[in-house]
């Protein structure tokens, strides 16, 4: 195995100018990720330098067999933490040969929102808190849990340390460093309330880059869990009962909110979000009704509520924002399996472009 390890870690830049580009896209479920690699003649610094590519959409649930070709458009580049050197990860979106976005391509519509001059002028910032659960591969039960049984009640696990409280830290730390290497603006990690559940944060990131970075961070996490022999779940309520669910809280601000008098802008934006609560809930992730129960630090899915420092609210405003009269707010409704292209663009559209 030492030769295999040596080859995996082989530095190609010592012997060739060629690089490997791993093209990544979202699969047919809207949550699964796919990727394949190609050789390029030399280093690349911008997506516009990359060729489009294609794949068999009939094998991913994205095209019929008789017309199966789907075209990948490169959109964002990251350093490859697995191959290293000049090799890259490429986040793509998917189109028909005629140039129409396929139904699972949510980036295309998001890009239209973020390129709107009114949105661009507000320089929207996002900080996304991505929660996930690590599962034992063969039994699909959280790591650290006895097979067919349960650990002690919640309480000691949040940000906990020790072999009886923290499960999967090697995976989490590997992911943290790999994201930093890749150029993702990952800002932190922590153990969550349910044992075997973790969170990483991406941001602040501007506009559509926040969603690109979340997707690539998810991809890197899937690759690391593949190596580690565990399974990552983005199910918003992986274990029924008295256990916390998994969300993807979205922290958000605009230029106007970050400036003097911004708190009034924040309150107006929250009012707008309340008026479109049902539309946002419908777009914030599948199975979210199992998580948004009014318990375990959530608001009830049918009720819109906001408050300062209230983790049982739909929207939480921080004490610092209230005190300083400017800042950001946190939308606590998105589920862990949400599509960040949909969530980030919808928040911008509702708060900046929509007039009730």
From Swiss-Prot:
Transmembrane segments: none annotated. It catalyses: L-glutamate + NH4(+) + ATP = L-glutamine + ADP + phosphate + H(+). Induction: By nitrogen deprivation, sucrose, glucose and fructose. Down-regulated by ammonium supply. Induced during leaf senescence. Expressed in root tips, root hairs and epidermis. Ubiquitously expressed with higher levels in siliques and roots. GO terms for molecular function: ATP binding; copper ion binding; glutamine synthetase activity. Gene3D superfamilies: Glutamine synthetase, N-terminal domain, Glutamine synthetase/guanido kinase, catalytic domain. The modification N-acetylserine is found at residue 2. Residues 19-99 form the GS beta-grasp domain. The modification Phosphoserine is found at residues 2, 48. Its EC number is 6.3.1.2. Residues 106-356 form the GS catalytic domain. Phosphorylated by CRK3. It is an enzyme of class 6 (ligase). It is found in: Cytoplasm. PANTHER family: GLUTAMINE SYNTHETASE (PTHR20852), GLUTAMINE SYNTHETASE CYTOSOLIC ISOZYME 1-1 (PTHR20852:SF93). High-affinity glutamine synthetase which catalyzes the synthesis of glutamine from ammonium and glutamate. May contribute to the homeostatic control of glutamine synthesis in roots. This is Glutamine synthetase cytosolic isozyme 1-1. It comes from Arabidopsis thaliana (Mouse-ear cress). The gene is GLN1-1.
